[in-house]
């Protein structure tokens, strides 16, 4: 791969990274009790807890909803990133990355 092609590919990768920064995935658990927002870069943007659905006598349930929502959000974000990167994977190997 020529240096020009390498430079073009690196620009595409940087553009993709910026796109992933802007994309937000939302996951809800507990019928809306907990909502997690995460970017395509696997960065938690926001965690929202709806107090109307929370039983203070069962904090364990809230913890499970939070844990499940965060895990699912991370998995969805990883899947999104992998799908976006797939077309570039062969060319990235040529760059030695």
Label every PLM stretch briefly.
Residues 13, 42, 66:
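Residue-level signature of catalytic and energy-coupling elements of molecular machines
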Residues 26-48:
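N-terminal intrinsically disordered, cationic/polar leader segments
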Residues 65, 69-80:
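Stable alpha-helical structural segments in soluble proteins, enriched in small hydrophobic residues
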């Amino acid at each position: 791969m020529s240096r020009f092609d390498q430079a073009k590919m690196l620009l595409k990768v940087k553009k993709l990274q910026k796109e992933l920064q802007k994309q937000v995935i939302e996951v809800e658990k507990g019928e809306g009790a907990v909502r997690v927002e995460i970017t395509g870069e696997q960065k938690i943007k926001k965690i929202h807890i709806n107090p109307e659905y929370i039983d203070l006598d069962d904090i364990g349930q809230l913890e499970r909803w939070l844990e499940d929502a965060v895990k699912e959000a991370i998995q969805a974000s990883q899947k999104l990133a992998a799908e976006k990167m797939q077309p570039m994977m062969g060319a990235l190997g040529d760059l030695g990355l």
